[in-house]
Amino acid sequence: TDLAASAPARPIVVLGMHRSGTSAIAKTLLGLGAWMGSEQFVTRRTEHALVQDCNQRLLNGHGGHWSAAPELVDGWVSDPASSDVVADARVALRDLAGHGPAAWKDPRNAFTLPFWRSLLGGDPVAIIVYRHPLEVAASLAKRNDFGIGHSVALWEQYNRALLVSAAGLSVTSVAYSALALDPIRTLTAVRESLTEFGVDLPGTASDAASDVESDRRHHVFDTLPDEIVTPQQRALWGALCGLAPHDEHFTTPDLPEVHPASRELLAERRAAIAARRDADERATELRSRRALLRRLVGKSGRDA
């Protein structure tokens, strides 16, 4: 198809929760020689701005937000809210095409990858990067002032979603702790996996490893206290730690159903965000009406 011809061939998609090392991986991919997009589109976090915008619109259009993603139902990839994003998504894919091996990173890929897969001419390869949930929670508390319950529920939601989204793909998995402790060894393994998957990057692991230094591990946890995490979250962490570093055909691991309390917490967050959006829209409409009224009053005064 025309779209397949203007989309990157076998791109690398980085999958991981916020604050889990996705930025570090993206920087190293850039150092290895991956094309991350035209200069005007690549953000300081090595994200493609158009991909980022499309992902945000996909989550928003289905009633969610990055901090409480929607529960997507079968058929969402082609529903009206997703169809509205297709034209801009094609622009992003064209920008990523034609420059050798391409890659993109946005934590929201965990949910939106099925949409992007539907637009590509072939399957991407994926790099899954995962991090201890309490380290993620500590980082989110510092950056976003999130409570630990919300943060761990969000960690669970993202990681469960990416394990489903990656089904059938060639996947290399990376523990953030390994990347931080031994970046050269970790990136050598990643690069070798990508080569075996048919994606040959020209750079060396030693050159790319220097980009990990600014992403050092500031929060370190080794345990999962029962009073903080649910059994389901503990099972998810075990599944992530058990991922093969090199998997030609990824199979989603079996996981127990999400604890109702975690699901309820994120539903409440979505409801609060929706209420705030409605209030913002009403305030914008009110300001517009006031501005129109002032113009009409001014015109009436001049006519008099």
Regions found by a protein language model. Name each.
Residues 57, 61, 75, 88, ...:
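Residues that form generic nucleotide/phosphate-binding pockets
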Residues 1-8, 84, 163, 192-304:
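PAPS-dependent sulfotransferases, especially Golgi type II membrane carbohydrate sulfotransferases
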Residues 20-24, 112, 278:
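Conserved alpha-helical elements of sugar-nucleotide-dependent glycosyltransferases
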Residues 1-86, 288:
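PAPS-dependent sulfotransferase catalytic core
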Residues 31, 36, 135, 181, ...:
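Active-site micro-motifs of SAM-dependent methyltransferase domains
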Residues 61-65, 147-154, 224-230:
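A polyampholytic, Gly/Pro-enriched intrinsically disordered region
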Residues 43-45, 181, 209:
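Positions that flank functional sites
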Residues 90-202:
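PAPS-dependent sulfotransferase catalytic domain
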